[in-house]
């Protein structure tokens, strides 16, 4: 009750001309009033401030109509037909916004630029005169290891000594020697020698497992549970070893034939396609 009394004390009395319009205006003002008295009207209650400005303009206009014209001797009071609509005049003068619903009809104004420049592509002479920007090129510099070296697939062929050396190291140091020689070798024959050493190591391990499977244990009893599995694993190792030997042998022969074919191309004689393959 105290809030409503404070809010009603803010408004000035509205003349009863016309009655229905004053009643509607008072209800509209009550609808847009802020909930508290200490709220700033201009910032936190824009709807209330715009409605209040519109109501005050209406009240001033009604008071102007009800007062007699001093230039009129008959004391005639102006009627409502003599007034000018305040909404259009206020909008034309730009004093205040009539209501919140007037923003619905507002449209953004787009400034038309009549001096827009039409961009056109350059002519052929201008495009031809324009120099191309520089581009970075990647140049690979391969050191010269000698005129006798032949490279196949980016790696030199190698010699027979590297082949035998890699195979011996892979056999003397099983698995570890293969990894060292295969990773550190920079020639085709060196890597094939490491693979040959690995295949011979697998063949040797498989043969030992098969031979030990038929021997008696220390307690003079056969371990029948492990015999079939040990023979199977040994057989698989022997098969893998033989396959690696065949693959490495064919690879070694192919590299040697390619080396011979490339070396013959330096001579005046022609080589047949069969020799290259």
UniProtKB/Swiss-Prot annotation:
According to the record, the residues making up region (Disordered) are 1-130
What ranges does the record list as Polar residues composition bias? 1-11, 82-91
Transmembrane segments annotated in the record for this chain = 160-180, 233-253
Which GO cellular component does the record give, naming just one? endoplasmic reticulum
One Gene Ontology BP term is: induction of programmed cell death
- How does this protein sit in the membrane? Multi-pass membrane protein
Q: Where is the composition biased (Acidic residues)?
A: 113-122
Kindly report the protein's main subcellular placement as a broad class: endoplasmic reticulum
Q: Cite the entry's keywords alphabetically.
A: Endoplasmic reticulum, Membrane, Stress response, Transmembrane, Transmembrane helix, Transport, Vacuole
Which locations, inside or outside the cell, does it occupy? Endoplasmic reticulum; Vacuole; Membrane
The protein's matches in Pfam families, at most eight in alphabetical order, are given as: NEDD4_Bsd2
Is Transmembrane helix one of the keywords UniProt gives this record?
A: yes
Query: What family is reported?
Result: Belongs to the BSD2 family.
Q: What PANTHER family does UniProt report for this protein, alphabetically?
A: NEDD4 FAMILY INTERACTING PROTEIN (PTHR13396:SF5), NEDD4 FAMILY INTERACTING PROTEIN 1/2 (PTHR13396)
Record's function text: Required for homeostasis of heavy metal ions such as cadmium, cobalt and copper.
Q: From the Swiss-Prot or TrEMBL record, give the protein name.
A: Probable metal homeostasis protein bsd1
The organism is Schizosaccharomyces pombe (strain 972 / ATCC 24843)
Lineage summary: Eukaryota, Fungi, Dikarya, Ascomycota, Taphrinomycotina
Instruction: State the encoding gene.
Output: bsd1
């Amino acid at each position: 009750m105290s809030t409503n009394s404070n809010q009603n004390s803010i408004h000035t009395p509205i003349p009863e001309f016309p009655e229905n319009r004053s009643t509607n205006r008072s209800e509209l003002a009550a609808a847009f009033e802020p909930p508290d008295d200490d709220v700033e009207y201009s910032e936190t209650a824009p709807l209330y401030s715009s409605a209040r400005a519109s109501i005050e303009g209406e009240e001033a206009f009604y008071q102007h109509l009800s007062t007699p014209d001093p230039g009129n001797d008959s004391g005639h009071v102006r009627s409502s037909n003599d007034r000018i609509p305040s909404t259009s005049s206020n909008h034309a003068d730009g004093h205040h916004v009539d209501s919140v619903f007037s923003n619905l009809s507002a449209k953004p104004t787009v400034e038309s630029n009549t001096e827009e420049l039409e961009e056109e592509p350059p002519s052929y002479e201008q495009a031809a005169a324009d120099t191309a920007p520089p581009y970075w090129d990647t140049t690979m510099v391969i050191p010269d290891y000698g005129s006798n070296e032949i490279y196949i697939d980016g790696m030199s062929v190698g010699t027979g000594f590297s082949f035998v050396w890699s195979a011996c190291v892979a056999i003397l140091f099983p698995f570890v020697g293969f990894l060292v020689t295969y990773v550190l070798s920079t020639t085709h024959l060196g890597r094939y020698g490491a693979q040959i050493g690995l295949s011979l190591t697998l063949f040797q391990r498989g043969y030992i497992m098969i031979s030990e499977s038929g021997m008696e244990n220390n307690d003079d009893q056969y371990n029948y549970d492990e015999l079939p599995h040990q023979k199977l694993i040994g057989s698989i190792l022997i098969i893998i070893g033989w396959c690696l030997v065949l693959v490495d042998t064919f690879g070694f022969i192919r590299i040697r034939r390619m080396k011979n074919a490339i070396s013959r191309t330096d001579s005046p004689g022609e080589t047949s396609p069969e020799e290259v393959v």
